[in-house]
Amino acid sequence: MSSKEFTNISSQIIKDSFSLWLNQHTEEGQTIAEICIANAQARQKSNKKVDRKKIISGPALPGKLTDCTTDDPEQGELFLVEGESAGGSAKRARDRNFQAILPLKGKIMNTWEVDVSEVLASQEVNNIAIALGVEPGSNNLDGLRYGKVCILADADSDGLHIATLLCALFLRHFRPLVEAGRVYVSMPPLYRIDQGKDVHYALDDPEKDKLVKELQKKNKRTKIEVQRFKGLGEMNASQLRETTMLPGARRLVQLTVKNGDKSSQMVDMLLSKKRSQDRKEWLEDKGNLANV
């Protein structure tokens, strides 16, 4: 039955009989043809999607990158997470279907005045570039592997410093990503506020104070407990998911640049080594506005 001779004979018999049947049953034949075409198109589309993981030629993806499973780059989100401890929590909190995690070790270098030809000397910057599929200084975003890039750092002053350095990196060396609206800053809470069984979160001190007053006004009998997170690593996976990573519940601030705005001038004043005097004067003038 499985011999070559029998296969040739049976194939010819089936082909002739099936061709005759198709000629006599045109509607059914049309349906079968449409199914075959749809399946072929699905296979072709699937083959194209697989290329998402192979967009980058050359270096392999960073070993610390925990990638998502979606084959659609537009749906993917890359979280650049401060610290390996927080990176572990983020991996457990993420939706593996479309959220990828790249933990960053320590404080990223100040790249504001670093030439584009030298910026990849930083291992962390190199990992970011490879994970993104975009080279620093390039206007070509065809290889971009994610629709959103989310900076996720601690909510305290140290975390804000790291987030500022990452924003500077994108403004200086990945500006087309910013102009395309691809870069976001995640806003994790600094406080957890419990009143009975109710749980609330606050981004900063002003929001915490306002929320505590509102809760006291509504219910004076139930004790209010306030917990300050020391860092992202102190949050468990469920807390990180519901406050920072879950679409619809999280807060993201889009990093934007517009013609005529002063974003670059402000970052230059904050990070340029040559402008220490300008920084000193700015701190003397604006330092009272800081919440410390």
Predicted regions and their residues:
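Signal for well-folded cores of large energy- and translation-related assemblies
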Residues: 37, 66, 70, 85, ...
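A broad, structural surface signal
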Residues: 8, 12-20, 34, 130, ...
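A generic hydrophobic-helix recognition signal that picks specific residues
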Residues: 75-76, 147-149, 174, 227-229
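Conserved phosphate/anionic-ligand binding catalytic regions in large, soluble enzymes, centered on
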Residues: 69-94, 156-165, 230-245
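Conserved structured catalytic cores and adjacent interaction surfaces
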Residues: 85-87, 92-198
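Charged C-terminal transducer/switch regions of large nucleotide-driven machines
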Residues: 43, 53, 62, 157, ...
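GHKL-family ATPase ATP-binding module
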Residues: 1-107, 139-141, 148, 252-292
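Active-site-proximal structural scaffolding
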Residues: 7, 11, 58, 77, ...
